[in-house]
């Protein structure tokens, strides 16, 4: 099973979340997201979803809700980047709950931004030919889609990191431990002993110390036995 190193995933998450924050700040600073051409006068008016207020010729009240969603996504992304940085520096634990929290916040921020930009485009299409003649989007609008992609990628990497940790806890065994276990299993063999044979008969040799009559008298007392086993 292929396992991506956790440090590489955390470094990629820091890079993606930091890039998303920079893109959001750039979108906040630049106000020319779209150019509105009103009906009465042909002067172009720039507008941005970060403003919240609408031009006098476009009485749209729901733009404030879009601005709040954009600001909420920026705040969540800052906290998300902080959590990922603390995790990368081992200041918080590397458990499964932290990975799930980072993945959830990343997906939530990306979905919130996507919903806000979809609502903004819907309001532009709704106001077209009613309050203004036409509108033209600028290049800065496409940075919000790149920001959404960065947040979704960060969430996917967090879930991959969580999956790696779960798989490592359940199935993965360190190389040294697995090799030692394999060596132990290979070296341990059951050696069966042969059945015990019957005891050999003993050969008893009788020796007498003194020949003749005296030897026969003291034979019971001075008799010695030498036992040899026939192998």
Curated annotation (Swiss-Prot):
Motif (RVxF): 225-229
Extracellular-side positions: 35-71, 121-139
Function of the protein: Probably inhibits protein phosphatase 1 (PP1) in sperm via binding to catalytic subunit PPP1CC.
UniProt GO cellular component terms: inner acrosomal membrane; outer acrosomal membrane
One Gene Ontology term of the molecular function aspect: protein phosphatase 1 binding
Protein's name according to its UniProt entry: Transmembrane protein 225
Positions of transmembrane segments: 14-34, 72-92, 100-120, 140-160
Record text on subunit structure and interactions: Interacts (via RVxF motif) with PPP1CC.
Membrane protein topology class: Multi-pass membrane protein
Topological domains, Cytoplasmic: 1-13, 93-99, 161-231
Expression by tissue: Expressed in testis, specifically in spermatocytes and round spermatids.
The entry's keywords: Cytoplasmic vesicle, Membrane, Transmembrane, Transmembrane helix
Subcellular location field: Cytoplasmic vesicle, Secretory vesicle, Acrosome membrane
Annotated InterPro entries: TMEM225
Pfam family name, one: TM225
């Amino acid at each position: 099973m292929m396992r991506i190193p956790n440090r590489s995933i955390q470094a990629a998450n820091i890079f993606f979340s930091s890039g998303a924050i920079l893109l959001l700040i750039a979108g906040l600073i630049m106000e020319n997201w779209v150019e509105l051409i009103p009906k009465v006068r042909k002067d172009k008016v720039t507008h941005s979803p970060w403003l919240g207020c609408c031009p006098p010729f476009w009485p749209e009240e729901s733009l404030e809700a879009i601005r709040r969603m954009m600001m909420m996504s920026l705040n969540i992304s800052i906290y998300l980047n902080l959590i990922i940085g603390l995790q990368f520096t081992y200041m918080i634990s590397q458990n499964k709950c932290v990975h799930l929290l980072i993945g959830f916040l990343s997906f939530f921020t990306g979905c919130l931004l996507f919903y806000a930009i979809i609502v903004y485009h819907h309001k532009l299409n709704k106001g077209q030919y009613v309050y203004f003649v036409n509108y033209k989007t600028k290049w800065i609008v496409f940075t919000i889609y790149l920001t959404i992609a960065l947040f979704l990628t960060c969430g996917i990497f967090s879930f991959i990191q969580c999956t790696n940790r779960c798989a490592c806890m359940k199935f993965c065994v360190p190389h040294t431990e697995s090799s030692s276990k394999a060596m132990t299993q290979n070296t341990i063999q059951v050696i069966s002993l042969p059945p015990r044979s019957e005891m050999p008969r003993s050969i008893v040799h009788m020796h007498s110390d003194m020949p003749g009559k005296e030897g026969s008298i003291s034979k019971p007392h001075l008799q010695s036995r030498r036992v040899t086993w026939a192998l």
